[in-house]
Regions:
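Hydrophobic alpha-helical segments within soluble ligand-binding/sensing domains
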Residues: 1-25, 65-69, 111-115, 131-148
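Short, solvent-exposed amphipathic alpha-helices that sit
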Residues: 6-10, 34-53, 68, 90-94, ...
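Short beta-strand->loop
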Residues: 25-34, 58-59
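Hydrophobic alpha-helical
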Residues: 43, 56-118
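Hinge/cleft segment of the Venus flytrap/periplasmic-binding protein
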Residues: 47, 131-183
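Conserved phosphoryl-transfer motifs of two-component systems
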Residues: 125-126
Length: 183
């Protein structure tokens, strides 16, 4: 996927739902990992290009610690999101522990059962699905075509589209339906 576009999408979702003075907790993952850093960059680029002056509390931790809880509990926090699937689990736990579940706009990353449950239970408002299965499938397909047929990929980078999941379309991502979206 184009990770910067994913960051922009997350930012657009959030800033279309919160006031201009509301702060955002951004579970940013590991800044040394290119995917995480590019999502954060896209988020920041969207803010700059659209004149958003909202304060961002950046959290690079891998578990819900006291710093993350302090950020979530700040009275100015109107939204939160995570750039990685593990961070989404952490974020949901933090929102529940702090009593903020359903009170701030929250966006998670990737579709898996825990995130779908959080969406259905109104802890998460949206999930950005980065399609990891499709990423793996297309990567292996390109490799097999190269090794077996000698056919090099047409482009150096293969982009996989991302999708925004709402409660209204979550049924498409239920266990029985989800695999069918890959084909």
């Amino acid at each position: 996927p184009d990770y910067e576009v994913i960051g922009r999408t997350m930012a657009e979702l959030i800033f279309s739902h919160i006031p201009s003075f509301g702060s955002v907790v951004l579970c940013a993952g590991n800044p040394k990992w290119e995917q995480h850093a590019r999502i954060v960059q896209g988020f920041e680029d969207y803010m700059q290009e659209n004149g958003a002056q909202n304060r961002i509390y950046l959290d690079n931790s891998c578990c819900i610690g006291s710093e993350a809880q302090r950020n979530i509990l700040k009275p100015d926090v109107a939204a939160c999101c995570s750039v990685l699937s593990q961070g989404s689990v952490m974020l949901v736990q933090g929102l529940q522990q702090c009593g903020k579940a359903g009170k701030v706009f929250a966006v998670g990353s990737d579709v898996f059962e825990e995130n779908l449950d959080a969406l259905r239970n109104r802890i998460l408002d949206n999930i950005v699905q980065k399609n990891p299965y499709a990423q793996g499938y297309l990567g292996i397909k390109a490799l097999v075509e190269y090794l077996v047929q000698g056919k090099a990929p047409e482009q150096r980078t293969i982009y996989v589209g991302s999708e925004v999941v709402f409660r209204s379309n979550a049924v498409m991502y239920d266990r029985d339906n989800f695999r069918g979206l890959l084909l």
